């Protein structure tokens, strides 16, 4: 009875509806029409492979749409020139420390969870950008094997967003700096694996 309904079901229906209409009038069309259903949209990993595989090499015009949560299902409005989607960068962040017995030899340990916790607190403290919308989120954090073991590994899934590509770059740089500093503070090794990114877009007509 629950779903992540941010529009993908509606977008698929819109695309199929457009395909049905175009097939009915195909004899009056001149040129080629491509319908693109972007894979991996939630992780911002789908558009680049489409471009890299040449699917857009011969495309002259690109028309896209996105449903709006502010409109009801019966409004039937189409609004051009809306503000664009946020640019984003997404990372899997890995902290590697040193395991030790928390009761017997804590001085021998370097807690990956402590490093991650420092990162979480300070990521949320990144000053928001005065030039537009900026966002940061830690959506997943996992680590540790037992209450008496100083954990040698911890991972986080994080993302930053910005109203413009420049604002997102600001958030991205701050997030990287904070994660590296959090690891250094505890003596951990850090690995940040990019898991998707996209630039901002604005519709002007």
Language-model features and meaning:
Residues 113-205:
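Metal-dependent amide/peptide-bond hydrolase catalytic core
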Residues 3, 9-10, 27-140, 145-149:
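Histidine/acidic-residue-rich, glycine-tolerant segments that coordinate divalent metal ions
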Residues 11-15:
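Alpha-helical transmembrane segments that form the membrane-embedded catalytic/substrate-binding core
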Residues 17-30:
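Flexible, small-residue-rich helix->loop connector segments that border functional cores
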Residues 18-21, 53-54, 174, 178-182:
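Alpha-helical structural signal in soluble globular domains
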Residues 4-5, 106, 165-170:
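Ordered, soluble secondary-structure elements with a strong preference for glycine-centered loop motifs
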Residues 17, 45-49, 107, 170-173, ...:
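Generic recognition of short, well-ordered alpha-helical segments
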């Amino acid at each position: 009875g629950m779903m992540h309904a941010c529009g993908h079901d509606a977008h698929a229906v819109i695309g199929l509806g457009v395909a049905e209409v175009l097939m009915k009038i195909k004899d009056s069309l001149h040129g080629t029409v491509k319908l693109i259903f972007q894979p991996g949209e939630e992780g911002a990993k789908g558009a680049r492979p489409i471009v890299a595989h040449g699917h857009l090499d011969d495309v002259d015009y690109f028309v896209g749409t996105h449903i709006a949560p502010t409109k009801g299902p019966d409004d039937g409005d189409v609004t051009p020139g809306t503000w664009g989607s946020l640019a984003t960068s997404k990372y899997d962040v890995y902290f590697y420390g040193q395991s030790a017995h928390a009761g017997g030899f804590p001085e021998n340990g370097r807690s990956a969870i402590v490093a991650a916790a420092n990162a979480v607190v300070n990521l949320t403290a990144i000053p928001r950008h005065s030039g537009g919308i900026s966002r940061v989120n830690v959506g997943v954090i996992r680590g540790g094997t037992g209450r008496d073991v100083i954990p040698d590994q911890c991972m986080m899934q994080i993302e930053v967003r910005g109203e413009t590509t420049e604002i997102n770059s600001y958030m991205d740089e701050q997030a990287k700096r904070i994660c590296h500093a959090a690891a250094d503070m505890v003596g951990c090794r850090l690995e940040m694996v990019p898991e998707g990114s996209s630039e901002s877009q604005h519709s002007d007509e």
